[in-house]
Amino acid sequence: MVRLVDIIHMINTSIKSNKIKIENLYKSIFSDGHTTDFIFEESYVAIQHLDSSNSDPALLEINENNDGYRVSYWDGYSLAEVVEEPDISKALKTFKRLAKKLAKNLNRFQLN
């Protein structure tokens, strides 16, 4: 017997199938007028700070690969955090945590 929980788990197994959830996350966290760019592709999502004075601007990205998902956070100076997750739901939780961190840093340093 197939349960609804099993169906939902099977449906939300990729970045592409979580598009609405990811877009809503971006809109809710970065609605304060931050100058950011949102890039969504089938197996890649990025939130990048648009700063012409910085050749290496702050960037948050999630990549889907054969082993799972890689979430990378660049703070504008160096690679600050990399998390590998085998499961999309855990990867999205990490992505959300780091998106909040990115927004907080943009607010703190008034980079919007």
How would you name each of these model-derived features?
Residues 1-53, 77, 108-112:
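Negatively charged, low-complexity tracts enriched in Asp/Glu with abundant Ser/Thr
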Residues 7, 25, 91-94, 98:
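Charge-rich, solvent-exposed alpha-helical interaction surfaces
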Residues 53-80:
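Short aromatic-glycine-(Arg/Gly/Cys) micro-motifs in beta-strand/loop hairpins
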Residues 76-90:
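A short, exposed loop/beta-hairpin motif centered on an aromatic-Gly-Thr core
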Residues 97-108:
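Short arginine-rich
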